[in-house]
Amino acid sequence: SFEILKLYSIFKSGNKTKSIPQSYIPTQSFFDKIASFIRLNLFIPDSRIGWNYFAFKKAKKLIEDNNINCVITTGPPHSSHLIGKKIYEKFKLKWIVDLRDPWAELFYLKNKFQFNCVKKLNLKFELDVLNSADAIITTVGKRYQNIIKDKLSNTKNIHKIYNGYDKKAYDKIEEIKPDSYNIVFTGILSKNHNYHLFLEVLSLLKDKYKNLNMIFTFAGKIDKEIKNLFSEKIHFIDNGYVDHEKAIKIIKSSHLLINFNYLNTEDTDMVSGKLIEYLASGSPIINFSNSARESDIILKNSIKSFSADSNDV
């Protein structure tokens, strides 16, 4: 199937199989900006739309061969829900829509340029899906569920099911902590995140304690400017984008875990799967956020963890 991210990967690295995270839209170079513009304005709702024809063809065969009477579609990528809608219309079966993240309110769309007609088309796709589905599942809290309800033309079954983690796979990974106090962050860190407060905390610590034996271990994608800012404050170890098993190993090596909520996500109050995996490690967690009611509820499962905002410095 055709995906713009494959072309982007070939151009950047010469390898179309090199992974680019779903929620990561690089905009550092001129080519990045062009690719971002194309991705956000020509591929609606997302760059994975190119596989829909092939996915529907395969799904049709599976449904016919196995007498399937219920389908669950999960996103992002939200293009998968458009496959589900086509299946629903073709076979008249039960359809559950699983929103792992918001759709039209998706965090990385807020500070990116999209034509108004594109925004309207994306919203139309979402409304068509939500109003067709028999039930809706979200991983986020009551505030986002209210946003969904406002979009519905009739009452739907809306359920909240948090992300989870694979305990068996998690427990197989050995816990090895370094001698230095190890602060860990895994995932994507961009200018859309609430990281400035943590930089302020590190500055205060650096000024007050000159010989702190402390490191900041990072795994994932990070904006180059942000990486430089942290490198000035603390010994920064960048592991780059790693597979899930390596990410869990890094999480389990922590003395403290850091989570940065996305800016402008106060209404949706997202609870990531990463936060659940953080909790499973048993390490203390600081969640930096302006407003994280749902995250606060989750973090109450650990007496050593809390959410922090500018009033806590």
Kindly label every feature range from the protein language model.
Residues 137, 176-193, 199-202:
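Conserved donor-binding/catalytic core segment of Leloir-type glycosyltransferases
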